[in-house]
Amino acid sequence: MNIFSHANLGTTEERGDDAKRTILAGTDIVGDILKTTLGPKGMLKMLKGQHVNVTNDGAFILNNLMIDSPSARILIGSSTGQDWEEGDGTTSVAILASLLVKEAGKLEMHPTKILRGYRMAQAKCEEILSSISFEATKEDLLKLVRTTLCSKVLRYDLERFCEICVNAVEKLEGRNDLNLIQIIKCSGKLEDSYLDDGFLLKKDIRIDDVVNPRVLIANTSMDQDKIKVFGAKINVNSVGELEEMEKAEKIKIKGKVERISQNGVNVFVNRQLVYDYPLQLLRMKGIQAIEHADFDGVERLNNVLGGKILSTFDNMDESCYGTCESIRNVHVGNERMIKFSGVRSGASTIVLCGSSKEMLDEAERSVHDALCVLAKIKEDPRVIYGGGSSEMAMAVGLNKYAMEVPGAESDAILAFSSALQQIPKILADNGGYNGESIKASLRAEHNSGRTSYGVNVRNGSIGCMKEAGVVDSLRIKHRVVTAASETAQMIIKCDAIVKCKPRERTRE
């Protein structure tokens, strides 16, 4: 089918230089927006929409942008993928990809040769990263979290939050299920934040303390009058018939309570409301009911207590019940919550205190990034030095590698190297220093073999990142380079932009 036929008058196409300019403009927009947020001295962005958000989280910024450019949307998708896979490095992916596309635009050669050179450069970068990596110690884990959080809002109380994040992950005892770590937000001062053992359920209800409880978690209706609840209508001939219906409903709900109370259950957590009559029956059985718990809380509670979320109570066995050491009321800030202590799997709760909703939301995103980095380092414990040292090490290695490669591909490898060298320059620029001068000095140090040297944003100089304690995860850095390179190659290979006519909608 010819999409440019007279039947598709709404279809438009850009080719040649016009298409390349449009594609480059889209990637430049994303790169320019994000590059000022990179590093410890990165700036914040104020996002205005339904709510105002202040953040420097790359994935959050990109997901809230309204951009029509197709090349920009590809970068956003790549950054979002980085967030899903690794939890950190989202800003670096988008910036590096935009720089690679920009450097490729300066080369006057066929895109196929550029792509071949970029693939060769990508493979060489993977070799260089592996050669400069080393196994992380427990001290390196703290350094890794510091590097992650130093560019976030939590940098003002860095040591406290580093300790909170490391302890929370260590409690998992080798498991990488971050769903076992809950984050609760409340009003207060940031320095009042802490790590609490156990699980906190956000439910303002008073309960008696229970030791070694037997918990049944459910998502089931606990009302005996569905006619009133659903607004249905029935026709009866007498009040007696209505009374018989009421009795039948009560008998039904009583049977449900009997099934709930079997096998020694003393705490019942329900996703839905528990009405007065079943609540009375549960109390008579010595069962404490927690009703209308939020869905996310019920899912997490089921994970940490064990058992199952039930909707019916037939054929129950031991696997249906959860347990912990104790349940009691606690106050977090100005809110009353229910604490489940001594839960399995090393679950814990991070309580974040802040003066505003915007501060709490940004703190939550920062803690999530740090937890993701720590979880991934358990899978691959290798780390590298940060501060732009790894990017410059790859760039210098590519410069030497390009001298060995014949043909036009060497120019593409040098372009890849040039893009990598922009990362330490951006780090220095964001600190208010002379980025070009620092980049040149850092390149000279790496040419002399000092591969651990990077940008010291505290004093605007270059220094040893080993002494400064700045480390990055090898796994995350490897994926940043891979994702940015593959995204850039996809964009470079495009030679036209086709905008199709929207499908016509008709009433049938």
UniProtKB/Swiss-Prot annotation:
Function statement: Molecular chaperone; assists the folding of proteins upon ATP hydrolysis.
UniProt name for this protein: T-complex protein 1 subunit beta
Family: Belongs to the TCP-1 chaperonin family.
Top-rank taxon, per record: Eukaryota
SUPFAM superfamilies found in the cross-reference section: GroEL apical domain-like, GroEL equatorial domain-like, GroEL-intermediate domain like
Subcellular location: Cytoplasm
One cellular component term from this protein's GO annotations in UniProt: chaperonin-containing T-complex
Gene name as annotated: CCT2
Subunit structure, as described in the record: Component of the T-complex protein 1 (TCP1) complex.
Alphabetized PANTHER family for the sequence: CHAPERONIN
Record's signal peptide: none
Keyword Lipid metabolism among UniProt keywords: no
UniProt keyword annotations, A-Z: ATP-binding, Chaperone, Cytoplasm, Nucleotide-binding
Any GO MF annotation of the entry: ATP binding
Main subcellular localisation: cytoplasm
Source species: Encephalitozoon cuniculi (strain GB-M1) (Microsporidian parasite)
